Amino acid sequence: MMFQQSDRDRNHPQSPLWRLSSAFRYAIATLCFVLPVASASAQTPATGAKAPDFTLATPSGTSVSLATETAKGTTVLVVLRGFPGYQCPYCVKQVHDFVEHSSDFAARNFNVLFVYPGPAAQLDQHAKEFLEKQAELPANIKLVIDPEYKMTNLYGLRWDAPHETAYPSTFVLDKKGNILFEKISRSHGDRTSAEDILSQIKKR
């Protein structure tokens, strides 16, 4: 004869079914609590916060860490759209603008670090092609690649849509890595210019 539990037995705290049901409910409740926390960790750092450190490589393979750059002086961190399937003309224009003002940045002991994000496949080659559209980068300006959006995700800047990579963004960091200024653009052409940065610093 098959043993059948009554409703009362199934709901008894010592019942195996009751214990299994309780464990399942606990697991679901735990997931609901943990998932929002994981999502919150990717929030974009704001003015006054400390910028998360990262290490990326130049297209030629030289490692560059944000902490090393900020230790040298005020650092302008610019996240480009990188390679969304083509070379972004707004990015070309923005980098050209900063290169033209490199002496103004150098006079204030500023470093500029561009981040070029995109899918890992041939990203270094795409970045080299991008730099061919520029004059040679001066000593106080560097460009690093962000394959598979490591830094982009760390800063909560991933523009997760077809033919998109990252929201164009600019941060100004002091020598301790604290954010003095930040701008996150939600369109391709809304960029921070070199003059914008220089005028912001003059106000401080």
Task: Please report, for each region that a protein language model flagged, where it lies by residue.
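Structural micro-motif
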Residues: 138-141, 159-171
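Structural microenvironment flanking redox-active thiols in thiol-disulfide oxidoreductases
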Residues: 87-139, 150-152
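Thiol-/selenol-based redox modules, centered on thioredoxin-like
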Residues: 165-204
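Bacterial N-terminal signal peptides
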Residues: 26-37
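Short active-site neighborhood of thiol/selenol oxidoreductases, capturing the structured segment around
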Residues: 69-96
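N-terminal "domain-start" segment that seeds a small globular fold
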Residues: 40-68, 93, 97
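N-terminal secretory signal peptides that target proteins for export/translocation
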Residues: 1-22
